[in-house]
Amino acid sequence: MRRVAVIIPARFGAQRFPGKPLADLAGQPLIAHVVDRARRARGVDAVAVATDDARIAAAAEAAGAAAILTGPASTGTDRVAEAARKLMPSPDVVVNLQGDEPLIEPEAIETLVRAMEGGVEMATLARPLEPEELERTQVVKVVTDRHGDALYFSRAPIPHRRAGGVSALARAHVGIYAFTAAFLQEFAALPPGRLEAEESLEQLRALEHGHRIRVADTAYRGFGIDTPEDLDRARALLAAGPRE
């Protein structure tokens, strides 16, 4: 049986929201909500938080996750790769779950893990694209081939529909990833790509170097906390009832 670990990168010094992982959300640190959702996903054997901050590490352990202290890293994926090397027992599949997704649905994680079957080395999620999202650069779009592997990710409207409107093939990317343990280390060691730099999308590095990314469908829309205002929205959603 393959061993699946969810590793959550978290840092204290986010520019737009310093201390975000420890911000209070319904009486708990934000990072505790992410840990709890990850632990509820079936098929997950271990949940760990990768951080360079002792305060975040303590909050992670209090929430039931392993805390792995890492050095300063240029990206969250670099931090996850370092943590995966330190995690024992070693995982076969690593899920990179952002530490600012307190409403992540356990079913979305389960869908992602299932997508890693059949020799897939990297996978991610996508959902239907809403018409009002077509021109929004903060909503990343993805198009796939007939096998469900990504052809391209872009902040631009793709695919272009000559007749106008939103193509039925258009999907919005949900930024959670799974890797085989071996490919995670390979990916982290790859030099950044030109398209990655142009779009500011790290996943394009894999495509530029000739690797495939399996894209699985999900109903989860994604809800990242980037600002204090986002946190207020999350508080309102939790007060209205937990998303199951």
Curated annotation (Swiss-Prot):
Keywords: Cytoplasm, Lipopolysaccharide biosynthesis, Nucleotidyltransferase, Transferase. The keyword Nucleotidyltransferase applies. It catalyses: 3-deoxy-alpha-D-manno-oct-2-ulosonate + CTP = CMP-3-deoxy-beta-D-manno-octulosonate + diphosphate. InterPro entries: Cytidylyl_trans, KdsB, Nucleotide-diphossugar_trans. It holds the Pfam family CTP_transf_3. One of its GO terms (molecular function) is 3-deoxy-manno-octulosonate cytidylyltransferase activity. PANTHER family: 3-DEOXY-MANNO-OCTULOSONATE CYTIDYLYLTRANSFERASE, 3-DEOXY-MANNO-OCTULOSONATE CYTIDYLYLTRANSFERASE, MITOCHONDRIAL. Its EC number is 2.7.7.38. It comes from Anaeromyxobacter sp. (strain Fw109-5). Signal peptide: none annotated. Pathway: Nucleotide-sugar biosynthesis; CMP-3-deoxy-D-manno-octulosonate biosynthesis; CMP-3-deoxy-D-manno-octulosonate from 3-deoxy-D-manno-octulosonate and CTP: step 1/1; Bacterial outer membrane biogenesis; lipopolysaccharide biosynthesis. HAMAP family: KdsB. The gene is kdsB. This is 3-deoxy-manno-octulosonate cytidylyltransferase. GO terms for cellular component: cytosol. Activates KDO (a required 8-carbon sugar) for incorporation into bacterial lipopolysaccharide in Gram-negative bacteria. GO terms for biological process: CMP-keto-3-deoxy-D-manno-octulosonic acid biosynthetic process; lipopolysaccharide biosynthetic process. Belongs to the KdsB family. The keyword Transferase applies. It is found in: Cytoplasm.
